Amino acid sequence: VADAFKVPKKKRNPLIEKYAGMLALTKDLGQLVSSYSHGMKQKLAILSALIHEPKLMILDEPFVGLDPVAAHTVKGLMRELCDNGGAIFFSTHVLEVAEKLCDQIAIIRQGKLIVSGPTEEVRGNGSLEDVFLELEEDHE
């Protein structure tokens, strides 16, 4: 992946070591990926996505298969990327995660945008779960 993104060799090894260490993958990097658990494959995919230091990431359910420690680490990495001027679009069915991590929220139902905006505005005085359930009731 580092080759595909033309990450210089001098830069890639420190980045691989950094992210592998943070995601507890260091001792497993020499193993065949086919021997990895689902969670380890998810960590490797995240490491691969970060290796070229992107400004934009698009992630589909990035926390599925991760243990709580790895999920916490990934949340921190996502926040760091955004705090440094990057952006992340990610899908999740866990509304509490979206509420804690996201500055902007969009709720999509059957491929149609139902509501979007700053997290604080979308959730109002309730939670995202409250908003979602209310939207579901309105839809029925």
Predicted regions and their residues:
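ABC-family P-loop ATPase nucleotide-binding domain
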Residues: 139-140
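ABC transporter nucleotide-binding domains
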Residues: 1-90, 95-109, 114-115
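Aromatic-residue hotspot detector
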Residues: 58, 132-135
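Hydrophobic aliphatic residues
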Residues: 2, 78, 123-126, 136
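Conserved beta-strand-loop-alpha-helix hinge in the C-terminal portion
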Residues: 112-133
